[in-house]
Amino acid sequence: SAILIGSRFLLPSGQTYNGLMHINFESEGGRQAEVYRLPITGGENFLYLVEPGVYRIAPTRSVFGFYQEMMNVVIDGRQYRLPFPRDLLRQPPYTIKASKIVAMGILEARVLPALPGRQPQLRIRLDDGVSARRKVVQDTIRDMMDPNLSPETRESTIAWSRALQDSLMNILSEEQKRTTYKPAP
């Protein structure tokens, strides 16, 4: 089982591919909980292998296991510190089933323009709409067929091709579940 997440780093001047942030992906269970620290760099899609279970997005932890309230984001060589976004904490739990891929969406870090003499603000959100999840899966499928990849990398990604295809079909079926009639008042 795996999760698929994309990233986008936006400056006032446009998108950059030079960025880094970390989030945790954690299950319930106290000491026995599965905890994955996910590094996310700019403009890429990441396929992270996880154990089956129910997981939530969480702030990263310190060396001693305490949650870090502040999130560090590096964009174009500049470091930003901000409180971990509540929108990410409020995301519903993700149920990860064996040999399935869950497309989470695109994690977006946007630097807002600042007035002269003030620090720019940073907003982080997870774009988990159907179109964003579809784009992440389609881009991953396209990237895994790149002839410039090493044979070992291509073999490992092709092993996930069936799960990626199933994930894409599920997303497309969500997109087509629109009502074709006007409901009665």
Where are these regions (language model features)?
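Primarily secretory-pathway and cell-envelope proteins
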Residues: S1-Y36, S62-P185
